[in-house]
Amino acid sequence: MTNTIAEFLNTRGLSAAAVDVDATLARFQHEMAEGLAGRPISLAMIPAYIGIDKPVPVGKPVIVLDAGGTNLRAALVTFDAAGTSRVEKFSKTAMPGAQGTRATAQDFYNVLAGLLAPLLADADDIGFVFSYPAEITPDCDARLIRWTKQVDMPDLVDAMVGAGLAKALKARGHAKRITVLSDTVATLLAGKSAGISRRYSNYVGLILGTGTNIAYVAPNATITKVKNLPPNGAMTINAETGGFTGVPQTEFDRAFDATTKDTGDYTFEKMISGAYLGGLGRFVLQAGAREGFFSAPAKAALLECASLANKDFDDFCANPFSTGGALGAMPFNDGDRRAVMALGKPVFERAAKLAACNICAAVIQTGGGTDPLHPVCVTIDGSTYYRTKAVNLKSLVEQHVRDILGPRGLYADLIQIDEAPVIGAAVAGLTR
C-alpha cells in the first residue's frame, strides 16, 4: 500500500502539481494555430464572424433571444454610457422538443415568434444565443449540426436557424436583422459592455459549468482557413476546448472515460467540468478504497457505489459530515471522512489549474495584455467556476492565472457579468 494518499495520487499524476503548465500551454497554442489554419486537430476553432472593433451603442434597444436549455428566454436590453445594461420585458417559455416529446421546426419557430411578439415593436435587431453544435456562417447565421441536451426535433438538423426565424417573423409582418452566436462567444462579448468604462486590449470568454469552452479574439492574419478576411482586422473564435486532447489522462481519467457514452471525446471537459467531476471522483475514491485508505464498511459501500453526482461529491468534500447524497449515506468514521477529503479535493484543484491553462493560452493567443493599463478582459460564466465548495475554485484559478501570466509580462482581468450570455447577445446584435 502507498504510504500516504498524497503519494498515491502524485505517483498516478492526479494533482495540481502534476499539471505541466509550459507543456499544456504549448499544446494549446499549437492546436489553436493549426485549427485556424484548417488542419485537423482536437480543437474545432470555429470562426464566429463577429469582431470587437465597433463601440456598443448607448441607449439603443436590442432584442435578445436565448436557446440552450429547457427554456427559451427573451428580453429587451439597453446599455447606458457606463456600460450598465437594463434588461426589460423578460419572458421565457419551454423549449420545444425538450420535454420528452418530439417537436418540428415549425413548432420551434412558432414558439419563438410568439415569445418575441411583445418585443418586436421595440427594436430592429435580434441577438440570438444558440447553444447547440452549429456551424456559424459569414452572415452570422447558424446551421444546426446536431441537437444535444435531449432535444428531439430532427427536421431542424442541417437547417439555417437564423434564416428560419427571420422567415417566420417576416410572415408575421416583421423584418429583423438576426445575429446568431454561441453562449461562449456571447460570454466573451459581454465583456465589451464592461469595456465601455474600462479600456481593455482584447477579450476572452470562458464557460465552466456543466461543460466547458473558451472563445477569444484572434487576428485575421492568423485565420488562414477563412479566405479574403481584411488583413488588419480580428474575429472572435469559438475554440471548443472541451474536446482538447493535449492533456495526458491519468488511469482514473481513462477508467471514467470508458464508462461515458462518448468515450475518447471531450476528454478535457471530463477533467474540469461539473457534468463529469463527480463521476471521476467516484473512480478516485474507489481506487483509494482498494488501496486500503478506508475502513472495511466504508470500502464495501464505496465499491458498491454505481454513480456519484458532482453536487454530492463537492458537497461532501466541503462538509464531510453532511448526510445528503450517496456519500452522506455511507458508514464513514472520521478517518474515512479525512480520506474522502484528501482524495477528492485534488480532483477540483487539478481542474482549477487546467482551467487556468485554458484561459492563459487564449490570452496569449489574443496578442493583448502586454500593458497593465489595458489588460485582456476574461469574462467567466458557469456554476462550476463560481459555486464549487470543496475548494475555492475561483480563487485558485485567479492565482494560477497570475502565476502563469505574470512571468510572461501579461495581464488579464477576470470578471463576472450577471447573465453574461444574454448581455453578450445584446452586444452582438448591436455591433455586428
Labelled PLM ranges:
Residues K92-N110, A134-V204, N220-P248, N392-Q399:
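Glycine-rich phosphate-binding loop and adjoining helix at the ATP-binding site
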Residues M1-F90, A94, G100-D125, K170, ...:
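ATP-binding/phosphotransfer module of carbohydrate and carboxylate kinases, centering on a glycine-rich
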Residues I214-A215, K225-T267, M271-S273:
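Alpha-helical segment proximal to the catalytic Tyr-Lys
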Residues P57-G59, A121-D122, H174-A175, D183, ...:
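Short, well-ordered loop/turn elements at secondary-structure boundaries
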Residues G97, T184-A186, G209-T212, N220, ...:
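Acidic, glycine-rich active-site loops and adjacent beta-strand->loop/helix elements
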Residues G69-T70, F79-A81, P133, G211-N213, ...:
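Conserved beta-strand elements of beta-rich interaction domains across eukaryotes
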Residues L72-V77, L188-A190, G205-L206, T212-A218:
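Short beta-strand scaffold segments in enzyme catalytic cores
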